[in-house]
Swiss-Prot record:
The gene is ttcA. A motif (PP-loop motif) lies at residues 44-49. This is tRNA-cytidine(32) 2-sulfurtransferase. PANTHER family: AMINOTRAN_5 DOMAIN-CONTAINING PROTEIN (PTHR43686:SF1), SULFURTRANSFERASE-RELATED (PTHR43686). Its cofactor is Mg(2+); [4Fe-4S] cluster. It comes from Aliivibrio fischeri (strain ATCC 700601 / ES114) (Vibrio fischeri). One of its GO terms (molecular function) is ATP binding. Pathway: tRNA modification.
Length: 307
């Protein structure tokens, strides 16, 4: 990271503290990291995974428990991929790491017709390789760099295109049932990560597969959410809070809630029917940090009390 001015250092410290706090809260709320864990931190070379590794290394220094980190990057043999960047960066950090070389690029190019999205196949191939690598390394947890915006986008994708009220959980058991997958940045906003990565000046490596494909469903949902966030500040926070405050009895999934057993002797369930009530919308919980302008300590005034 290049040398910062006094004002820039203040704003960097403030942002780092915010991301660190949000990450720590997510880890605590979902019990993501336990004593003795060996965590495989998946490092793609993008802003999210760089930030995740950075914050986890910081938390490791002050955590009341002991855990190990090993950074893993999957070199998918994309043309022009700068294979030297991550090893050099990780060597400087002094963190344990492993570069896994697998030519998934050729497989994707061979199987997917030109113009079609490659994300689904690429994701499945990458997932299988990472699960295998985690087993080889003796990792107990696999850490992915998805943030709050990713989680919300996934929920809307499933609603709009899959007909499911399903998101991206902060913690789950891997597809093969052998590992626990965690998302430590689940409480972090993408806009904060973008600012932080820019201040950190990470050696970002763009993805030539998914990053060059316009008009994808996820991009449309991202644009929709960004528009809402600009027009109605606080909506993103409110929607994420809703994902943590689910009332199955007031939805329509009879597999989740036993509607058939309800009768006139059941009594009021979760507040009863609100269909006839006047809607009372609570004040949007705008993030306090977002409402505060950046501060330059050099402009601070000395206030003198006058009797």
């Amino acid at each position: 990271m290049s040398e910062l001015t006094k004002a820039q250092q203040y704003n960097f410290n403030k942002l780092q503290k915010k991301i660190r706090r949000n990450t720590g809260n997510a880890i605590a709320d979902y019990n993501m990291i336990e004593d003795g864990d060996r965590i495989m931190v998946c490092l793609s070379g993008g802003k999210d995974s760089f930030t995740m590794l950075d914050i986890l290394m910081s938390l490791k220094k002050s955590a009341p428990i002991s855990f190990d980190l090993i950074a893993v990057n999957l070199d998918q043999k994309q043309p022009g991929f700068p294979a030297h960047i991550l090893p050099e960066y990780l060597e400087k950090l002094g963190v344990e790491y492993k570069i896994v070389e697998e030519d998934t690029y050729s497989i994707v190019q061979d199987k997917i017709p030109e113009g079609k999205t490659t994300c689904s196949l690429c994701s499945r191939l990458r997932r299988g390789i990472l699960y295998r690598t985690a087993k080889e390394l003796g990792a107990t947890k696999i850490a992915l760099g998805h943030h709050r915006d990713d989680i919300l986008e996934t929920m809307f994708l499933n609603m709009f295109y899959g007909g499911k009220l399903k998101g991206m959980p902060p913690k789950l058991v891997s597809d093969n049932g052998e590992h626990v997958v965690i998302r430590p940045l689940a409480y972090c906003r993408e806009k904060d990560i973008i600012k932080y990565a820019d201040m950190r000046d990470y050696p970002i490596i763009p993805c030539n597969l998914c990053g060059s494909q316009p008009n994808m469903q996820r991009q449309n949902v991202k644009q929709m959410l960004n528009t809402w966030d600009k027009q109605f500040p606080g909506r993103i926070e409110t929607m994420f809070t809703a994902m943590q405050n689910v009332v199955p009895s007031h939805l329509a999934d009879f597999n989740t809630f036993d509607f058939k057993s309800i009768n006139r002797d059941s009594g009021v369930i979760n507040g009863g029917d609100i269909g006839f009530d006047k809607e009372e919308m609570p004040t949007l919980p705008v993030d306090a940090d977002d409402a505060v302008a950046e501060f330059d300590p050099s402009l601070k005034l000395d206030v003198v009390n006058v009797d």
